[in-house]
From Swiss-Prot:
HAMAP family: DarP. One of its GO terms (cellular component) is cytosol. One of its GO terms (molecular function) is ribosome binding. This is Dual-action ribosomal maturation protein DarP. GO terms for biological process: assembly of large subunit precursor of preribosome. It comes from Shigella boydii serotype 18 (strain CDC 3083-94 / BS512). Member of a network of 50S ribosomal subunit biogenesis factors which assembles along the 30S-50S interface, preventing incorrect 23S rRNA structures from forming. Promotes peptidyl transferase center (PTC) maturation. Keywords: Cytoplasm, Ribosome biogenesis, RNA-binding, rRNA-binding. Belongs to the DarP family. InterPro entries: DarP, DarP_sf. It is found in: Cytoplasm.
Amino acid sequence: MTKQPEDWLDDVPGDDIEDEDDEIIWVSKSEIKRDAEELKRLGAEIVDLGKNALDKIPLDADLRAAIELAQRIKMEGRRRQLQLIGKMLRQRDVEPIRQALDKLKNRHNQQVVLFHKLENLRDRLIDQGDDAIAEVLNLWPDADRQQLRTLIRNAKKEKEGNKPPKSARQIFQYLRELAENEE
């Protein structure tokens, strides 16, 4: 009887494939159900959107048709349609959809933050004058320096005379127009 070499199993043809990258990731049934339920809630959020908001979310034709149908259906049929939408979402990459939905939800918050920044900039313009004008011109090169100076001068006079802050409101409006034109 001949003795087999010690590495005889390593020489099996077709066994050169490395199995290190082919790890099996075990996912519990409960986690799968939680993910499915979360996608169903995402689908329900999308169904509750209006037509204009729905246009801003990247959806393929089948999913869009299912969502539009769910918007027309009431009661038990709607629940089944939402389950179908959840199933369709499981078969797709939902990250772009989530990002678009978050962008729609956070639009108001972003606008409030922008208004606070513009109000602070307006107050600095009134308090600091030319130094703050340079900052505005760095942010928006097409801003009119002369118009800003005039508005700032008028705002300072109104503040000293305890008059209503008409020019301060005009400065804010001008800064808001500059910010909107930038977008």
